[in-house]
Regions:
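Bacterial N-terminal signal peptides that target proteins for export
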Residues: 1-8
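C-terminal motif of bacterial Sec signal peptides marking the signal peptidase cleavage site
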Residues: 18-21
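Beta-rich carbohydrate-recognition and catalytic domains
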Residues: 25-126, 133-219, 224-303, 315-320, ...
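Conserved positions at the start
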Residues: 65-67, 126-128, 218-220, 308-311, ...
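Non-cytosolic beta-sandwich-type ligand-binding/adhesion modules
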Residues: 101, 164-170, 178, 333-343, ...
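Extracellular beta-strand-rich recognition modules
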Residues: 234, 388, 574-578
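Juxtadomain low-complexity/linker regions and immediately adjacent membrane-anchoring helices
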Residues: 412, 418-475, 509-522, 577-597
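Aromatic, loop-rich ligand-recognition surfaces of beta-strand-rich domains
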Residues: 472-535, 558-597
C-alpha cells in the first residue's frame, strides 16, 4: 500500500483532538480533507495517488487476461485473499493462470494454475476457467479447451471445443485434470472431456459432426450449487463457418451461441436427461418467434456475432438469476445481461433494459470503458461484486487487448416490483469504496434518517442512500433531482455518533443535470474530550476533468463522484448544501456514500 496523506496541504485539520482551547461545548472549524484532485508530481491528472486503505480505482493493471473467475477465500491459509483465474494470452492459451490480490486492483501472479498433460484431450485453446469451492477442502475448475490431440481417445473428439474438469486442494493450485470413475460408472481418462458431446447434442436431435469447421462448440462453463444439488451452465455455440444447413434459429455465416444447462450427479457426471436450452438469441424466451418477444438488449448490442455466452447463476429469495454476456466478444458493446426464472433450469425470461436487463455495459460514445463483459459475481464479506474484463486501452477491445476491473453489485427493484441484479459501473477513473471486509469501513448512509429541501416535484429522496448510482439513462436505478436555480439541502442524521472517515457524493449520469460544486458540507462532530460542534468544508469542487466526455456532452463517466477523505471523526449528522446553478431543468445527485463504522 502507498503512504497517502489524507489532509490537503493547503488545509490544516482543526478538530481540536487533544488541543488546548477545545473545552467549549460547541465550536465550528474548517474540515481538513483530501478530495483526490491534487495533480501528481509530474503534473498529470489521471491515476493520482489515493488512500488505498479506503478506496480502489480500476486502473486496469492486470492486462492480457480475460474471462475472469474470482473467488474470495474466507478460511485457511489464504483467508481474506482474492484469487483470479482467467484466459491468459501470456500463456498462449495453453494453460490457465492464477493471480492473488488483497484489494482486487493490485494482483500478484501465482504462475500457472493448470496446464494439461500432453496426453490430454484438451491440449490447446484453454479458455474461460470457473472455480468453485466445495466447502470440504477441494477447489474444482471447469474450463473450455480445443482438442488438437489426434492421439487422445483415438481422435474421437479431435477439432472440437469441449468442457474439462480439474481439481486442487488449494486456491493457488496446482490443479490437475480430473480422471477416474464417474457416478455413471464410466471411466474418464486424460483423453476424455467430462461431457460426451454426442449425448449432449442428441437431446435436441442435432448430431454433432466431427471436423474443425462443422461443429458445435461447448465452452464458458460454470458450476452452481443450489443447496445439495449441483448444476452446470455452458454456452453451446455454432461456429460462424458451419457448413451444416442452418436451422431457423441460426443466421448463416454468423456465429451464434446460446446458454444451456444441465443438472450434475456430482462434479464429474452430468445427468444428460436434464440438458436444457435456456436462452434464444434475440428473444426474451426460448419459445420466442415474433417481434413481440424481441429482447431489446440482445438486438441493440448485436454485432457480426450473435451470442449469449459466459453464463453464471445467482440465487436470491427463491429467484434464479441467469446472467450472461451479449454482443460480440470484440465489440465495444459486449455487456452483461440477465434473465429471471423460478428454477435452476428455467424457463427463464430475459429482462428489457428498462426493467434492469442490462447489468453491466457501456453506451455510445463512451471513451472510458469498452467491452465490459464475461463476468464473475464474487461475494466479499456481506457484499457482492462483479469482476469482468474490458478493453485495456478503454476505447477498443480485442482478444489481445483485455484487462480486469470490478464494481459493486446488489439487488435493486424495477417498476414491476421485481428484484433484479444491478451493478455500480463500469467505473473507470473515479475512486470507489473498497469492500468493507477489506477496509473495515462500510457505507452507513442507508442507516441514516434523510431529509431534503428543494426537491423537484415528482422526485424521491430514496435514491440518495439506496447504495446505487445510475450508470445509464434507462434502467432501474434512479437519481434524486432538485429544482434548478434554488438552494438545496440534504441532511443525514444517525441516532448515535459514528466513526466516519470519508464521504463520496455521486454526480448525475446525465451531463445536463450535473452539479459543479457543493457550497458547504457540514459535519456534526464530537471530539475525544466530548466537545461537540461542526466541521465545515466550503466550495468543494467536482472534478470534471477526469469524469466528463466533453466531446459528446451527453453522459458523465459512470461512478463520477466528489470525494472527501479525512482522518476519522465521530459524526452524528451531515448536511450538504448546494445551489442548483441552472435557471431551468434540474440538478441530480446519484448517491451518497458515508464510509464509517
Amino acid at each position: 500500500m502507498k503512504f497517502f496523506k489524507k489532509l490537503a496541504p493547503a488545509v490544516a485539520l482543526a478538530l481540536c483532538f487533544g488541543i488546548g482551547g477545545c473545552g467549549d461545548t460547541s465550536f465550528s472549524v474548517k474540515l481538513g480533507y483530501n478530495d483526490g484532485t491534487l495533480p501528481n508530481e509530474d503534473g498529470t491528472l489521471f491515476y493520482r495517488e489515493y488512500d488505498e486503505s479506503l478506496f480502489y480505482r480500476n486502473d486496469l493493471t492486470l492486462k492480457k487476461v480475460a474471462d475472469p473467475s474470482v473467488i474470495y477465500v474466507e478460511e485457511g491459509e489464504y483467508a481474506g485473499k482474492l484469487f483470479l483465474y482467467g484466459t491468459s494470452n501470456t500463456l498462449s492459451v495453453r494453460g490457465i493462470g492464477v493471480w492473488q490480490s488483497d484489494d482486487g486492483v493490485h494482483w500478484d501472479s501465482y504462475g500457472v494454475a493448470f496446464e494439461p498433460e500432453t496426453a490430454s484431450w484438451g491440449y490447446s485453446s484453454l479458455w474461460a476457467p470457473e472455480v468453485i469451492y466445495d466447502g470440504a477442502g477441494k477447489y474444482y475448475m471447469t474450463y473450455s479447451a480445443r482438442n488438437s490431440n489426434t492421439i487422445a481417445a483415438g481422435g474421437k473428439y479431435y477439432g472440437n471445443t469441449y468442457i474439462g474438469l480439474a481439481v486442487s486442494d488449494s486456491p493457488a493450485g496446482p490443479f490437475v485434470q480430473w480422471t477416474g470413475t464417474n457416478a455413471d460408472g464410466a471411466e474418464i481418462g486424460l483423453g476424455d472431456p467430462i461431457f460426451d458431446p454426442a449425448k449432449i447434442t442428441a437431446v435436441d436431435g442435432v448430431a454433432c459432426e466431427a471436423g474443425h469447421y462443422a461443429r458445435y462448440r461447448f465452452l464458458d462453463s460454470s458450476l452452481f450449487a443450489d443447496g445439495d444439488e449441483l448444476y452446470m451452465y455452458f454456452s453451446r455455440g455454432k461456429d460462424r463457418y458451419n457448413v451444416l444447413t442452418p436451422g431457423a434459429d441460426y443466421a448463416y455465416g454468423k456465429e451464434t451461441s446460446e446458454i444451456w444447462g444441465v443438472k450434475m450427479k456430482d462434479f464429474s457426471t452430468p445427468d444428460y436427461s436434464t440438458v436444457t436450452r435456456l436462452t434464444k438469441v434475440g428473444y426474451n424466451t426460448v419459445d420466442g418467434e415474433t417481434e413481440a418477444d424481441y429482447n431489446d438488449i440482445d438486438r441493440e448490442r448485436a454485432s457480426a456475432d450473435q451470442i449469449n455466452e459466459a453464463p453464471q447463476m445467482y440465487k436470491r429469495d427463491g429467484v434464479y438469476y441467469l446472467t450472461y454476456s451479449v454482443g460480440g466478444t470484440t465489440s465495444n458493446f459486449y455487456s452483461v445481461a440477465q434473465a429471471l426464472g423460478s428454477s435452476p433450469l428455467g424457463p427463464f425470461t430475459k429482462l428489457s433494459k428498462a426493467d434492469g436487463g442490462l447489468v453491466l455495459g457501456t453506451e455510445m460514445n463512451w471513451i472510458q470503458a469498452a467491452g465490459t463483459g464475461h463476468h464473475s459475481f464474487t461475494p466479499i464479506g456481506d457484499e457482492l461484486f462483479i469482476f469482468h474484463h474490458e478493453g485495456a486501452d478503454r476505447y477498443t477491445i480485442d482478444s489481445e487487448n483485455r484487462a480486469i476491473a470490478y464494481d459493486r453489485a446488489g439487488m435493486a427493484e424495477n417498476s414491476k416490483g421485481q428484484k433484479v441484479l444491478a451493478a455500480n459501473g463500469p467505473t473507470s477513473y473515479s475512486l470507489q469504496p473498497l469492500p468493507a471486509a477489506i477496509s473495515g469501513y462500510k457505507n452507513i448512509a442507508p442507516e441514516a434518517e434523510v431529509s431534503v429541501s428543494g426537491l423537484k416535484e415528482g422526485s424521491d429522496k430514496k435514491w440518495l442512500t439506496d447504495g446505487f448510482f445510475a450508470s445509464h439513462l434507462t434502467g432501474v436505478v434512479g437519481e434524486t433531482e432538485f429544482d434548478a436555480g434554488t438552494t438545496a439541502e440534504i441532511s443525514l442524521r444517525w441516532k448515535e455518533y459514528r466513526t466516519v472517515g470519508a464521504l463520496l457524493l455521486y454526480n448525475s449520469i446525465d451531463y445536463d443535470k450535473t452539479f459543479y460544486r457543493i457550497a458547504r458540507i457540514s459535519l456534526s462532530v464530537r471530539t475525544a474530550s466530548g466537545a461537540t460542534g461542526t466541521a465545515v468544508a466550503d466550495n468543494a469542487a467536482f472534478p470534471f476533468d477526469e469524469t466528463t466526455n466533453y466531446s459528446s456532452q451527453q453522459l458523465m463517466f459512470a461512478g463520477s463522484n466528489l470525494v472527501l477523505d479525512f482522518n476519522d471523526i465521530e459524526v452524528n449528522g451531515i448536511t450538504i448544501t448546494f445551489r442548483a446553478p441552472r435557471s431551468e431543468g434540474s440538478v441530480a445527485v446519484g448517491d451518497i456514500c458515508v464510509l464509517g463504522k
